[in-house]
Amino acid sequence: MIRAFDALSLPLLRLLDPEDAHRLAIQGLRLLPQAAPPADQPNLSVRAFGLNFSNPVGIAAGFDKNAEAPDALLRMGFGFVEIGTVTPKPQSGNPRPRLFRLERDEAVINRMGFNNDGGEVVLRRLAARSARGGIVGVNVGANKDSEDRVADYVRLIEMFAPVASYFTVNVSSPNTPGLRNLQQAAALDDLLAKVIEARERVRAIAGDTPVLLKIAPDLTLNELDDVVHIARSRKVDGMIVANTTLSRTHTLREQARAKEQGGLSGRPLFRLSTRMVAETYVRAEGAFPLIGVGGIDSGGAALTKIRAGASLIQLYSALIYKGLGLVESIKQDLASTLLRTGRDQLSEIVGADAPMITAEDWPV
Protein backbone atom coordinates (compact mmCIF):
# COMPACT_ATOMS: atom_id res chain seq x y z
CA MET A 1 0.00 0.00 0.00
CA ILE A 2 2.78 2.42 0.90
CA ARG A 3 4.69 1.76 -2.31
CA ALA A 4 1.53 2.32 -4.33
CA PHE A 5 0.80 5.56 -2.49
CA ASP A 6 4.32 6.85 -3.14
CA ALA A 7 4.30 5.76 -6.79
CA LEU A 8 1.05 7.59 -7.42
CA SER A 9 1.56 10.63 -5.25
CA LEU A 10 5.21 11.69 -5.42
CA PRO A 11 5.38 12.60 -9.14
CA LEU A 12 2.08 14.46 -8.94
CA LEU A 13 2.81 16.31 -5.73
CA ARG A 14 6.18 17.55 -6.99
CA LEU A 15 4.35 19.36 -9.81
CA LEU A 16 2.20 21.33 -7.40
CA ASP A 17 2.84 24.32 -5.19
CA PRO A 18 4.43 22.89 -2.01
CA GLU A 19 1.60 23.94 0.27
CA ASP A 20 -1.09 22.69 -2.11
CA ALA A 21 0.82 19.41 -2.39
CA HIS A 22 0.92 19.09 1.38
CA ARG A 23 -2.82 19.67 1.65
CA LEU A 24 -3.45 17.03 -1.00
CA ALA A 25 -1.16 14.55 0.75
CA ILE A 26 -3.10 14.91 4.01
CA GLN A 27 -6.38 14.35 2.18
CA GLY A 28 -4.94 11.33 0.38
CA LEU A 29 -3.80 9.74 3.63
CA ARG A 30 -7.28 10.08 5.09
CA LEU A 31 -8.72 8.13 2.16
CA LEU A 32 -6.40 5.14 2.43
CA PRO A 33 -7.85 1.79 3.57
CA GLN A 34 -7.76 1.25 7.32
CA ALA A 35 -5.34 -1.65 7.25
CA ALA A 36 -3.41 -2.69 10.34
CA PRO A 37 0.08 -1.18 10.61
CA PRO A 38 3.00 -3.48 9.75
CA ALA A 39 4.38 -5.41 12.71
CA ASP A 40 7.66 -4.04 14.02
CA GLN A 41 10.76 -6.04 14.86
CA PRO A 42 10.98 -6.54 18.65
CA ASN A 43 14.50 -5.10 18.72
CA LEU A 44 13.16 -1.73 17.54
CA SER A 45 11.03 -1.17 20.64
CA VAL A 46 11.97 1.80 22.80
CA ARG A 47 10.84 2.89 26.24
CA ALA A 48 11.15 6.63 26.78
CA PHE A 49 9.30 9.30 28.79
CA GLY A 50 7.37 6.47 30.47
CA LEU A 51 5.91 5.41 27.10
CA ASN A 52 6.43 2.23 25.09
CA PHE A 53 7.22 2.88 21.42
CA SER A 54 6.99 -0.05 18.98
CA ASN A 55 9.70 1.59 16.88
CA PRO A 56 11.76 4.80 17.15
CA VAL A 57 10.62 6.52 13.93
CA GLY A 58 8.12 9.34 14.39
CA ILE A 59 6.75 12.08 12.20
CA ALA A 60 7.62 15.58 13.31
CA ALA A 61 5.20 18.37 14.08
CA GLY A 62 4.26 20.45 11.08
CA PHE A 63 3.12 17.63 8.84
CA ASP A 64 -0.25 17.04 10.48
CA LYS A 65 -0.79 20.40 12.13
CA ASN A 66 -4.49 19.92 12.77
CA ALA A 67 -4.71 16.24 13.77
CA GLU A 68 -6.45 15.29 10.55
CA ALA A 69 -4.55 12.07 9.86
CA PRO A 70 -2.74 10.70 12.93
CA ASP A 71 -4.24 7.23 12.60
CA ALA A 72 -3.40 7.03 8.90
CA LEU A 73 0.19 7.96 9.72
CA LEU A 74 0.39 5.31 12.43
CA ARG A 75 -0.84 2.79 9.85
CA MET A 76 2.01 3.88 7.60
CA GLY A 77 4.41 2.42 10.17
CA PHE A 78 5.39 5.40 12.29
CA GLY A 79 6.05 4.55 15.91
CA PHE A 80 4.51 7.84 16.99
CA VAL A 81 2.95 10.95 15.54
CA GLU A 82 3.37 14.53 16.74
CA ILE A 83 0.58 16.88 15.68
CA GLY A 84 0.65 20.69 15.71
CA THR A 85 1.94 23.18 16.37
CA VAL A 86 -1.41 24.07 17.96
CA THR A 87 -2.20 27.51 19.38
CA PRO A 88 -5.17 28.42 21.61
CA LYS A 89 -6.90 30.48 18.94
CA PRO A 90 -6.99 29.59 15.23
CA GLN A 91 -4.63 31.62 13.09
CA SER A 92 -3.89 31.80 9.40
CA GLY A 93 -0.12 32.14 9.68
CA ASN A 94 2.10 34.20 7.44
CA PRO A 95 1.16 35.27 3.90
CA ARG A 96 1.73 32.83 1.04
CA PRO A 97 4.03 31.82 -0.50
CA ARG A 98 5.59 30.55 2.70
CA LEU A 99 6.86 27.06 1.84
CA PHE A 100 9.70 26.46 -0.62
CA ARG A 101 11.44 23.36 -1.95
CA LEU A 102 15.18 23.41 -2.55
CA GLU A 103 15.08 20.29 -4.68
CA ARG A 104 18.77 19.95 -5.53
CA ASP A 105 19.56 20.22 -1.82
CA GLU A 106 16.68 17.96 -0.73
CA ALA A 107 15.73 20.76 1.63
CA VAL A 108 12.76 22.93 2.52
CA ILE A 109 12.42 26.50 3.75
CA ASN A 110 9.24 27.42 5.58
CA ARG A 111 7.87 30.52 7.21
CA MET A 112 4.42 29.13 7.94
CA GLY A 113 3.84 30.99 11.19
CA PHE A 114 1.87 28.43 13.25
CA ASN A 115 -1.11 28.30 10.90
CA ASN A 116 -3.63 25.96 12.53
CA ASP A 117 -7.31 25.43 13.30
CA GLY A 118 -6.97 26.38 16.96
CA GLY A 119 -7.09 24.41 20.17
CA GLU A 120 -10.81 23.69 20.37
CA VAL A 121 -11.09 22.23 16.86
CA VAL A 122 -7.94 20.12 17.16
CA LEU A 123 -9.00 18.91 20.60
CA ARG A 124 -12.30 17.62 19.21
CA ARG A 125 -10.46 15.65 16.54
CA LEU A 126 -8.09 14.04 19.03
CA ALA A 127 -10.90 13.27 21.47
CA ALA A 128 -12.79 11.48 18.69
CA ARG A 129 -9.85 9.12 18.04
CA SER A 130 -8.45 8.75 21.55
CA ALA A 131 -9.78 5.19 22.02
CA ARG A 132 -7.80 3.95 19.01
CA GLY A 133 -4.48 3.90 20.78
CA GLY A 134 -1.07 4.73 19.40
CA ILE A 135 1.28 7.43 20.64
CA VAL A 136 0.13 10.88 19.48
CA GLY A 137 1.98 13.85 20.94
CA VAL A 138 0.76 17.44 20.86
CA ASN A 139 3.14 20.26 19.96
CA VAL A 140 1.95 23.49 21.58
CA GLY A 141 2.77 27.12 20.86
CA ALA A 142 1.61 30.68 21.41
CA ASN A 143 -0.58 32.84 19.20
CA LYS A 144 1.27 35.53 17.31
CA ASP A 145 -0.90 38.30 18.82
CA SER A 146 -0.94 36.87 22.32
CA GLU A 147 -0.44 39.33 25.17
CA ASP A 148 0.61 36.51 27.51
CA ARG A 149 2.42 33.74 25.69
CA VAL A 150 3.13 31.73 28.81
CA ALA A 151 -0.61 31.64 29.50
CA ASP A 152 -1.15 30.23 26.00
CA TYR A 153 1.09 27.25 26.74
CA VAL A 154 -0.55 26.69 30.12
CA ARG A 155 -4.03 26.78 28.61
CA LEU A 156 -3.09 24.20 25.98
CA ILE A 157 -1.54 21.85 28.54
CA GLU A 158 -4.75 21.94 30.54
CA MET A 159 -6.92 21.50 27.43
CA PHE A 160 -5.08 18.62 25.80
CA ALA A 161 -3.89 16.65 28.83
CA PRO A 162 -6.71 14.06 28.58
CA VAL A 163 -5.87 13.20 24.94
CA ALA A 164 -2.13 13.86 24.51
CA SER A 165 0.39 11.03 24.81
CA TYR A 166 2.99 13.71 25.45
CA PHE A 167 3.45 17.46 25.03
CA THR A 168 6.13 19.33 23.15
CA VAL A 169 6.70 22.90 24.27
CA ASN A 170 7.76 24.64 21.08
CA VAL A 171 9.83 27.74 21.79
CA SER A 172 12.09 27.31 18.79
CA SER A 173 10.10 28.14 15.67
CA PRO A 174 11.81 31.03 13.86
CA ASN A 175 8.58 32.13 12.19
CA THR A 176 6.71 33.72 15.10
CA PRO A 177 8.41 37.01 16.02
CA GLY A 178 9.97 36.90 19.46
CA LEU A 179 9.12 33.26 20.16
CA ARG A 180 12.74 32.13 20.35
CA ASN A 181 13.26 34.67 23.14
CA LEU A 182 11.50 32.13 25.34
CA GLN A 183 14.69 30.05 25.10
CA GLN A 184 16.51 32.71 27.13
CA ALA A 185 17.25 31.52 30.64
CA ALA A 186 14.88 33.58 32.79
CA ALA A 187 11.99 33.36 30.34
CA LEU A 188 12.45 29.62 29.82
CA ASP A 189 12.63 28.92 33.53
CA ASP A 190 9.38 30.80 34.11
CA LEU A 191 7.65 29.09 31.19
CA LEU A 192 8.67 25.56 32.17
CA ALA A 193 7.77 26.16 35.80
CA LYS A 194 4.25 27.18 34.84
CA VAL A 195 3.87 24.39 32.27
CA ILE A 196 4.88 21.74 34.79
CA GLU A 197 2.52 23.30 37.36
CA ALA A 198 -0.30 23.07 34.81
CA ARG A 199 0.53 19.43 34.13
CA GLU A 200 0.39 18.72 37.87
CA ARG A 201 -3.01 20.40 38.22
CA VAL A 202 -4.61 18.05 35.69
CA ARG A 203 -2.74 14.91 36.74
CA ALA A 204 -5.77 13.49 38.56
CA ILE A 205 -7.81 13.35 35.35
CA ALA A 206 -5.07 12.93 32.76
CA GLY A 207 -2.21 11.12 34.44
CA ASP A 208 1.43 12.14 34.29
CA THR A 209 1.63 13.32 30.68
CA PRO A 210 5.28 13.75 29.64
CA VAL A 211 6.45 17.28 28.79
CA LEU A 212 9.22 17.71 26.22
CA LEU A 213 11.07 20.87 25.18
CA LYS A 214 11.92 21.53 21.53
CA ILE A 215 14.94 23.72 20.90
CA ALA A 216 16.58 25.49 17.97
CA PRO A 217 19.81 24.26 16.38
CA ASP A 218 21.10 27.83 16.35
CA LEU A 219 21.74 28.09 20.09
CA THR A 220 25.29 28.79 21.16
CA LEU A 221 26.88 26.21 23.43
CA ASN A 222 26.66 28.65 26.34
CA GLU A 223 22.96 29.08 25.66
CA LEU A 224 22.58 25.32 25.45
CA ASP A 225 24.24 25.01 28.86
CA ASP A 226 21.51 27.21 30.32
CA VAL A 227 18.68 25.48 28.46
CA VAL A 228 19.68 21.97 29.54
CA HIS A 229 20.31 23.10 33.12
CA ILE A 230 16.83 24.64 33.30
CA ALA A 231 15.21 21.62 31.65
CA ARG A 232 16.84 19.37 34.22
CA SER A 233 15.99 21.58 37.19
CA ARG A 234 12.35 21.85 36.09
CA LYS A 235 12.28 18.09 35.53
CA VAL A 236 11.04 18.04 31.96
CA ASP A 237 10.73 14.53 30.61
CA GLY A 238 12.79 14.99 27.45
CA MET A 239 13.99 17.30 24.70
CA ILE A 240 13.54 17.40 20.94
CA VAL A 241 16.67 18.48 19.08
CA ALA A 242 16.26 20.38 16.84
CA ASN A 243 13.91 22.70 14.98
CA THR A 244 14.68 24.40 11.67
CA THR A 245 17.71 26.66 11.29
CA LEU A 246 18.01 30.27 10.22
CA SER A 247 21.56 29.65 9.04
CA ARG A 248 22.46 29.07 5.39
CA THR A 249 25.61 27.31 4.27
CA HIS A 250 27.61 28.24 1.19
CA THR A 251 27.29 24.64 0.01
CA LEU A 252 23.59 25.00 -0.81
CA ARG A 253 23.09 24.52 -4.52
CA GLU A 254 19.91 26.56 -4.72
CA GLN A 255 21.42 29.81 -3.49
CA ALA A 256 18.69 32.00 -4.98
CA ARG A 257 15.92 30.07 -3.25
CA ALA A 258 18.02 29.88 -0.09
CA LYS A 259 17.58 33.65 0.31
CA GLU A 260 13.93 33.14 1.23
CA GLN A 261 13.24 33.99 4.85
CA GLY A 262 12.29 31.18 7.19
CA GLY A 263 13.59 28.01 8.75
CA LEU A 264 15.69 25.59 6.70
CA SER A 265 15.14 21.85 7.11
CA GLY A 266 16.15 18.71 5.28
CA ARG A 267 19.53 17.27 4.35
CA PRO A 268 21.59 20.49 4.89
CA LEU A 269 20.47 20.54 8.53
CA PHE A 270 21.77 17.06 9.29
CA ARG A 271 25.25 17.81 10.63
CA LEU A 272 24.23 20.89 12.60
CA SER A 273 21.30 19.14 14.25
CA THR A 274 23.31 15.98 14.93
CA ARG A 275 26.04 18.01 16.60
CA MET A 276 23.34 19.67 18.72
CA VAL A 277 21.91 16.26 19.67
CA ALA A 278 25.34 15.13 20.87
CA GLU A 279 26.00 18.35 22.77
CA THR A 280 22.60 18.08 24.47
CA TYR A 281 23.11 14.40 25.27
CA VAL A 282 26.43 15.09 26.98
CA ARG A 283 24.94 17.92 29.03
CA ALA A 284 21.82 15.99 30.01
CA GLU A 285 23.94 13.23 31.60
CA GLY A 286 21.11 10.73 31.29
CA ALA A 287 18.53 12.95 33.01
CA PHE A 288 16.07 12.47 30.15
CA PRO A 289 15.89 10.97 26.65
CA LEU A 290 16.16 12.95 23.42
CA ILE A 291 14.29 12.89 20.13
CA GLY A 292 16.63 13.67 17.25
CA VAL A 293 15.30 15.62 14.27
CA GLY A 294 16.91 17.21 11.25
CA GLY A 295 17.99 15.87 7.89
CA ILE A 296 17.30 12.18 8.50
CA ASP A 297 16.80 10.62 5.07
CA SER A 298 18.15 7.06 5.38
CA GLY A 299 18.80 4.25 7.79
CA GLY A 300 22.41 5.37 8.04
CA ALA A 301 21.41 8.91 8.94
CA ALA A 302 18.97 7.58 11.54
CA LEU A 303 21.71 5.42 13.05
CA THR A 304 24.08 8.39 13.22
CA LYS A 305 21.46 10.45 15.03
CA ILE A 306 20.84 7.64 17.52
CA ARG A 307 24.55 7.12 18.15
CA ALA A 308 24.79 10.89 18.72
CA GLY A 309 22.33 10.58 21.60
CA ALA A 310 18.77 10.30 20.29
CA SER A 311 16.57 7.56 21.73
CA LEU A 312 13.93 8.33 19.10
CA ILE A 313 13.96 10.16 15.78
CA GLN A 314 11.51 12.17 13.69
CA LEU A 315 11.16 12.71 9.95
CA TYR A 316 9.46 15.30 7.81
CA SER A 317 11.35 17.01 4.97
CA ALA A 318 12.83 13.78 3.60
CA LEU A 319 9.31 12.41 3.08
CA ILE A 320 8.76 15.11 0.46
CA TYR A 321 11.60 13.71 -1.62
CA LYS A 322 11.59 10.01 -0.74
CA GLY A 323 8.00 9.27 0.21
CA LEU A 324 6.46 7.33 3.07
CA GLY A 325 8.35 4.18 2.05
CA LEU A 326 11.32 5.77 3.80
CA VAL A 327 9.79 4.83 7.15
CA GLU A 328 9.96 1.07 6.55
CA SER A 329 13.38 1.40 4.91
CA ILE A 330 14.81 3.10 8.00
CA LYS A 331 13.27 0.55 10.33
CA GLN A 332 14.63 -2.36 8.31
CA ASP A 333 18.11 -0.83 8.25
CA LEU A 334 18.10 -0.23 12.00
CA ALA A 335 16.87 -3.75 12.80
CA SER A 336 19.45 -5.28 10.46
CA THR A 337 22.25 -3.24 12.00
CA LEU A 338 21.33 -4.43 15.48
CA LEU A 339 21.30 -8.06 14.36
CA ARG A 340 24.57 -7.72 12.49
CA THR A 341 26.37 -6.14 15.45
CA GLY A 342 24.94 -8.48 18.07
CA ARG A 343 22.89 -5.82 19.84
CA ASP A 344 19.52 -6.62 21.36
CA GLN A 345 18.05 -3.11 21.59
CA LEU A 346 18.66 0.36 20.20
CA SER A 347 19.19 1.64 23.74
CA GLU A 348 22.58 -0.11 23.72
CA ILE A 349 23.96 2.31 21.13
CA VAL A 350 22.27 5.57 22.11
CA GLY A 351 24.97 8.21 22.56
CA ALA A 352 27.86 5.89 21.68
CA ASP A 353 29.39 8.50 19.37
CA ALA A 354 28.52 11.62 21.37
CA PRO A 355 32.08 12.16 22.68
CA MET A 356 33.50 11.94 19.16
CA ILE A 357 30.84 14.21 17.66
CA THR A 358 31.31 16.88 20.30
CA ALA A 359 35.04 16.91 19.66
CA GLU A 360 36.33 19.93 17.77
CA ASP A 361 37.34 17.95 14.72
CA TRP A 362 33.78 16.76 13.93
CA PRO A 363 32.76 19.35 11.34
CA VAL A 364 29.28 20.83 11.17
Swiss-Prot record:
Its cofactor is FMN. Pfam families: DHO_dh (PF01180). It is an enzyme of class 1 (oxidoreductase). It is a peripheral membrane protein. Keywords: Cell membrane, Flavoprotein, FMN, Membrane, Oxidoreductase, Pyrimidine biosynthesis. Its main location: membrane. It comes from the Bacteria. The active site is at residue 173. It is found in: Cell membrane. Gene3D superfamilies: Aldolase class I. One of its GO terms (cellular component) is cytoplasm. GO terms for biological process: 'de novo' pyrimidine nucleobase biosynthetic process; 'de novo' UMP biosynthetic process. Monomer. HAMAP family: DHO_dh_type2. Belongs to the dihydroorotate dehydrogenase family. Type 2 subfamily. PANTHER family: DIHYDROOROTATE DEHYDROGENASE (QUINONE), MITOCHONDRIAL, DIHYDROOROTATE DEHYDROGENASE (QUINONE), MITOCHONDRIAL-RELATED. This is Dihydroorotate dehydrogenase (quinone). The lineage of its organism: Bacteria, Pseudomonadati, Pseudomonadota, Alphaproteobacteria, Hyphomicrobiales.
